[in-house]
Amino acid sequence: MTDLRHYDVIVSPSITEKSTLVSEQNQVVFNVAKTASKPEIKAAVEALFGVKVTAVNTLIRKGKTRRFRGFAGKLKDVKKAVVTLAEGQSIDVSTGL
């Protein structure tokens, strides 16, 4: 049985033009929790999807400044993880968890 903490680490798949391009190199992009470490992300992906992960790269996308009714606000920062899968394995992110 999967640990419920794995669902707290992986927030959602990131479906963008760039993420569909890197899927050809056997990589998948996820939005992850801000406090998640690379070993936690690797363990969560392997447990939830049943695949072998070879590498995890992370980045933090800074939130943009937005104006609403004359007041400046800021969108939240988002942490993303680019997960490289072992050769011959894949994840269909459109089906969900």
UniProtKB/Swiss-Prot annotation:
<dbReference type="InterPro" id="IPR012678">
    <property type="entry name" value="Ribosomal_uL23/eL15/eS24_sf"/>
</dbReference>
<keyword id="KW-0699">rRNA-binding</keyword>
<comment type="function">
    <text>One of the early assembly proteins it binds 23S rRNA. One of the proteins that surrounds the polypeptide exit tunnel on the outside of the ribosome. Forms the main docking site for trigger factor binding to the ribosome.</text>
</comment>
<dbReference type="GO" id="GO:0006412">
    <property type="term" value="P:translation"/>
</dbReference>
<keyword id="KW-0694">RNA-binding</keyword>
<comment type="similarity">
    <text>Belongs to the universal ribosomal protein uL23 family.</text>
</comment>
<dbReference type="GO" id="GO:0019843">
    <property type="term" value="F:rRNA binding"/>
</dbReference>
<dbReference type="InterPro" id="IPR012677">
    <property type="entry name" value="Nucleotide-bd_a/b_plait_sf"/>
</dbReference>
<dbReference type="GO" id="GO:0003735">
    <property type="term" value="F:structural constituent of ribosome"/>
</dbReference>
<comment type="subunit">
    <text>Part of the 50S ribosomal subunit. Contacts protein L29, and trigger factor when it is bound to the ribosome.</text>
</comment>
<dbReference type="GO" id="GO:0005840">
    <property type="term" value="C:ribosome"/>
</dbReference>
<protein>
    <recommendedName>
        <fullName>Large ribosomal subunit protein uL23</fullName>
    </recommendedName>
</protein>
<dbReference type="InterPro" id="IPR013025">
    <property type="entry name" value="Ribosomal_uL23-like"/>
</dbReference>
<dbReference type="GO" id="GO:1990904">
    <property type="term" value="C:ribonucleoprotein complex"/>
</dbReference>
<dbReference type="Pfam" id="PF00276">
    <property type="entry name" value="Ribosomal_L23"/>
</dbReference>
<keyword id="KW-0689">Ribosomal protein</keyword>
<keyword id="KW-0687">Ribonucleoprotein</keyword>
